[in-house]
Amino acid sequence: MEKKILEYLKRLEEVEVKISNPEIFENPKEYSSLSKEHARLSELKNVYDKVLGQEKILNDDKEALAQEKDPEMIAMLEEGIQLGKAEVDKLYKVLENLLVPPDPDDDLNVIMELRAGTGGDEAALFVGDCVRMYHLYASTKGWKYEVLSASESDIGGYKEYVMGISGAAVKRLLQYEAGTHRVQRVPETETQGRVHTSAITVAVLPEPAEDDEEVFIDEKDLKIDTFRASGAGGQHVNVTDSAVRITHLPTGVVVTCQDERSQHKNKAKAMRILKARIRDAEMQRRQKEASAMRSAQVGSGDRSERIRTYNFSQNRVTDHRIGLTLYNLDKVMEGDLDAITSALVSHAYHQLLQHGNEENS
């Protein structure tokens, strides 16, 4: 890893020389490409500098521990060393992700659809918790977050929630969130203290780029209905027909949006979701045809595949696809997802490399 990092740091210096040359502005496409590369390599350098700094502190603490006699100081140093090791491990996971070569689709925006599954009200509440988790994660990454559609449950949380997230490396880091997320905890309404298990499903749909010619939707293939928006319990919240339902007749895909007061805005959001779903359906079809792609994936990305368990009583989160278990669920629910998303990106890349080596051997 060290050798690869040093190669990237050398490349960073080369990129900085190129983008500081005024002539680069004569080629906007090259400038855009170099700017993205510079941002990625700069982040790698920042994380690597943090690793070096943390490792120096760790080594200093170990040297101090070897000479320390005072029991209180020994206990303090041992605790600091344990925390330092955990931080270094976390930073290395982020580094591994940054060392994975970029994919042309890494920066595609995504639409995330969260739906309550088994568990009724508790599942709906967990959808709300995960919506907050992803919102906080988006904030820490500097991504733009917007609500596209939300169907609230009667006791709080959501039966369904659709959000749009845009920014650098959005698809790269969020694509492996697709699947079934299982939660184990004691509901607030549980008087016996029993742990209940419920689940939600998450779909991650990359939005087609504006110049993506593969997703063409003919207006003649659309059936558009308008109706009055309704809130929780079914009451009408608007006196005009602002809600929009769009049906794509060739595929049968149906999208409904009613969160905006403007019919025009609801239609625009519904079209975004529709395009993303149609693109996703086409990608799923291609992946099923390409066995090599399937075998190199981190899980199948299928909505029904159980990918992760959140156990609140143990403060534990486990990603079953890569055998990763962390005992910091409290931080994860506050949006600290980097250790998980980075590990998944790195694992997927190593699987792809291994699969390629097997084919060439």
Swiss-Prot record:
Give the UniProt entry's GO cellular component terms. Answer: cytoplasm
| Post-translation changes | Methylated by PrmC. Methylation increases the termination efficiency of RF1.
Keyword check for Transmembrane helix: no
Q: What is the superkingdom listed in this entry's lineage?
A: Bacteria
Q: Which GO terms describe its molecular function?
A: translation release factor activity, codon specific
Q: Which SUPFAM superfamilies match?
A: Release factor
Main localization is: cytoplasm
User: Localized where?
Assistant: Cytoplasm
N5-methylglutamine PTM positions: Q235
Query: Per its UniProt record, what Pfam families does this chain match?
Result: PCRF, RF-1
Key words of the record: Cytoplasm, Methylation, Protein biosynthesis
Chain positions covered by the region annotation Disordered: 287-309
What the entry lists under SMART domains is as follows:
PCRF (SM00937)
State the family named in the UniProt similarity comment for this chain: Belongs to the prokaryotic/mitochondrial release factor family.
Q: Tell me, what does this protein do in biology?
A: Peptide chain release factor 1 directs the termination of translation in response to the peptide chain termination codons UAG and UAA.
Query: What name does this protein carry?
Result: Peptide chain release factor 1
Species this protein is from: Chlamydia caviae (strain ATCC VR-813 / DSM 19441 / 03DC25 / GPIC)
